[in-house]
Amino acid sequence: MSKVGTSDSKNTLYCSFCGKSQHEVRKLIAGPTVFICDECVELCMDIIREENKSSLVKSRDGIPTPKEICKVLDDYVIGQSHAKKVLSVAVHNHYKRLNHQTKHNDVELAKSNILLIGPTGSGKTLLAQTLARILDVPFTMADATTLTEAGYVGEDVENIILKLLQSADYNVERAQRGIVYIDEIDKISRKSDNPSITRDVSGEGVQQALLKIMEGTVASVPPQGGRKHPQQEFLQVDTTNILFICGGAFSGLEKIISARGRSTSIGFAAQVLAPEDRRTGEIFRHVEPEDLLKYGLIPEFVGRLPVVATLEDLDEASLKKILTDPKNALVKQYQRLFEMENIELTFADEALGAVARKAIERKTGARGLRSILESILLETMFDLPGLEGVEEVVISREVVEGTARPLYIYADRSDRTAESSASA
């Protein structure tokens, strides 16, 4: 039990874990010799929930079922039920293959790398990160735009394996069962349909370089990274069992898919739907390998990515959930910032809907939500530290639309006061 010895606060009780006083927390629970505050209790509950999730996915000989994987993905990623199902089945089969490959020699199971296709801000990267976290395997991310063929300025594809090795603390065995996520994979598409006289070192050349490590090869990885230390001893990493997930927005692919759809439907009975009348994510659901070839991926590269998961555009309801539901939701983050000034930040439900609609109009998906909130709250965050007596700030739909200023509630007034009823 923690008490202060000064005469002014000798009766003040303190949390034995975080040291906060009874005046700084909502509740202080007493034990035989200790006190614990409500904040520490919540933290303990979070730790227990995480432990329960890890024990759930480590059941059944270490292979989570697709439903178990999907259930955990639901806790972190809003929407995208189809992509979650595809990923859950693919990852389950991949690790089942690894655990049982030595038991049966009659049938060799091939590796199924995954291609994620979806609009910007739809959750591709978050899905890959969450998968690695719940499976407790080494994980690394690479940006395809920085990769070049060996011998040219830029990163070698072997650097991807080096990053994976580093995330596994140089444990080669663990790294060989890891997950690699390559983002912006659409940016290494072939620059033109016709073979060029000059080498395409950051497009088709990178696709060729990625082929071997994605299918399975023993890569020689320099522990200190690349070309600057030519004399160092190389580590041998077998990439056969590393799961590769490639993601990209594939801007313009929807036009190729729509054009193919129009060419196969002719006559008076053909149902013609203008591309602008269909959302990008809906069109992506009809992607075929031939569309990816036309986009600029080489046939061998498409063949190394047999599992294709398409993500849909996030609708207004999904974006509203993203704003409020996750543990680190944006609204919660800004509310925490305002709490530091002892001010409560409140968003009207219509305001959240207006923010979601703005993100849809800008076609930035979930990634654009922060910039929208930042612009809405900029003036308020600029003014508040210099104002006294403000107890609460209320954001309405009109504030989001730019026709009003935020409402301020002052501690010494019961009515809601606005700095200005309308913006100039």
UniProtKB/Swiss-Prot annotation:
SMART domains for this protein: AAA, ClpB_D2-small, zf-C4_ClpX
Q: Which residue ranges does UniProt annotate as crossing the membrane?
A: none
* Binding-site positions, Zn(2+): C15, C18, C37, C40
PROSITE patterns reported in the protein's UniProt record? CLPX_ZB
Q: Which residues bind ATP?
A: P119, T120, G121, S122, G123, K124, T125, L126
Q: Which domain of life is it from?
A: Bacteria
Q: Name one GO biological process term.
A: proteolysis involved in protein catabolic process
Q: Which residues are in the ClpX-type ZB domain? A: 3-56
> What UniProt keywords apply to this chain's record, in alphabetical order?
ATP-binding, Chaperone, Metal-binding, Nucleotide-binding, Zinc
Give any Gene Ontology cellular component.
Answer: HslUV protease complex
- A molecular-function term among this protein's GO annotations: zinc ion binding
Could you say which protein family the record assigns here? Belongs to the ClpX chaperone family.
HAMAP family cross-referenced by the UniProt entry: ClpX
Functionally, this protein is described as follows: ATP-dependent specificity component of the Clp protease. It directs the protease to specific substrates. Can perform chaperone functions in the absence of ClpP.
Recorded hits in NCBIfam families, A to Z, give: clpX, PRK05342.1
How this chain assembles, per its entry, is: Component of the ClpX-ClpP complex. Forms a hexameric ring that, in the presence of ATP, binds to fourteen ClpP subunits assembled into a disk-like structure with a central cavity, resembling the structure of eukaryotic proteasomes.
Protein name from the UniProt record? ATP-dependent Clp protease ATP-binding subunit ClpX
